[in-house]
């Protein structure tokens, strides 16, 4: 595939996703405004005075996400166990011991990584928009690191079995960050020019798209395959320069994509918040009405004679002396 083919793939998947974006933005706005900053990093926080979202819905969302964290992936107890194919409790003890040890190693590595804090963000997305996503990789110290991918910044497609096996995501980096990540020689002309400009190096950001999709030529034959023979392709493109800045592959699909409930044949999920939108909007509108009524009751509208302008004491318990003619 050429650069234009990857860009076309990403654009087509984004077009398919567009039908859900309005609902996602509305749910963020009325339930969890903070999530808007995740999905739209360039947006400016909106000071709605506390009347644009529901605190009750926000607390309910947090409780549901916390329940996911407590019962699905609890930090204080084992929630997964590795077993060999055809496992028998009284079978090959050496084999069973190896898998038990592997389970302990995985538990320890997850505990010292950022897995649980990132998983909390994923659960919030899952309960708010119906779809949550997390990316896993190794850092420079060969330790596990996880990244929350906010709903609205990626698009997905499924395999014939209904599993997500294709994902494209859009993100922005400054020229300085891009050079750190891939090296100056991998960057396109526009990014390199910004990198050499002291005023733009740390401030001008550029858009990139990462495409992870099945590799038709890939086979999981060993754990020492060249990138082009691994089961999944990984391509990152600079959209400003229309240039591939990084190309590699994965042995396993590196994204976890979880859906609360399914909506027909769409790869995207549906959350409880989706069905509660009408009730939440009504509650917000009612709160605004009660707020307005309270303001009107506390500070009623007054008719004043022109000659009284500036002489009426509007403070609590204030007294205004008027003439008999004005009365």
Features from the language model and the residues they span:
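Hydrophobic transmembrane signal anchors and adjacent membrane-proximal interface regions, especially
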Residues: 5, 29, 82, 144, ...
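Short, surface-exposed beta-strand/loop "edge" segments at domain boundaries and coil↔beta transitions
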Residues: 141-146, 162-165, 177-181, 216-223, ...
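Extended, charged amphipathic alpha-helical segments
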Residues: 219-327
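Intrinsically disordered, low-complexity regions of eukaryotic proteins
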Residues: 44, 48, 57, 78, ...
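Extended, helix-rich architectural segments
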Residues: 1-207
């Amino acid at each position: 595939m050429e650069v234009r083919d990857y860009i076309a793939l990403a654009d087509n998947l984004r077009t398919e996703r567009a039908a859900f974006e309005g609902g996602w933005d509305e749910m963020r706005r009325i339930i969890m405004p903070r999530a808007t900053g995740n999905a739209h990093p360039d947006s400016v926080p909106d000071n709605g005075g506390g009347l644009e979202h529901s605190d009750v819905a926000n607390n309910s969302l947090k409780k549901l996400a916390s329940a996911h964290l407590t019962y699905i992936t609890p930090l204080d107890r084992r929630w997964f166990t590795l077993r060999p194919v055809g496992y028998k409790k009284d079978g090959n003890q050496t084999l069973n011991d190896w898998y038990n040890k592997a389970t302990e190693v995985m538990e320890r590595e997850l505990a010292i990584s950022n897995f649980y804090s990132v998983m909390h963000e994923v659960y919030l997305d899952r309960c708010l928009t119906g779809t949550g996503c997390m990316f896993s990789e190794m850092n420079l110290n060969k330790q596990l690191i996880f990244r929350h991918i906010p709903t609205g910044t990626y698009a997905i497609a499924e395999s014939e079995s209904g599993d997500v096996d294709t994902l494209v995501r859009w993100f922005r980096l400054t020229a300085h960050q891009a050079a750190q990540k891939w090296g100056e020689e991998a960057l396109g002309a526009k990014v390199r020019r910004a990198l050499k400009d002291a005023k733009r190096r740390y401030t001008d950001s550029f858009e990139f798209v990462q495409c992870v999709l099945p590799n038709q030529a890939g086979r999981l034959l060993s754990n020492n395959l060249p990138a082009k023979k691994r089961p999944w392709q990984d391509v990152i493109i600079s959209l400003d320069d229309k240039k591939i800045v990084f190309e590699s592959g994965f042995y396993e699909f590196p994204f976890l994509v979880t859906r609360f409930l399914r909506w027909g044949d769409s790869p995207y999920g549906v959350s409880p918040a989706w069905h509660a939108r009408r009730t939440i909007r009504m509650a917000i509108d009612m709160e605004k009405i009660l707020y307005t009524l309270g303001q009107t009751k506390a500070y009623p509208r007054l008719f004043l004679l022109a000659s009284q302008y500036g002489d009426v004491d509007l403070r609590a318990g204030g007294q205004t002396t008027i003439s008999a003619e004005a009365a």
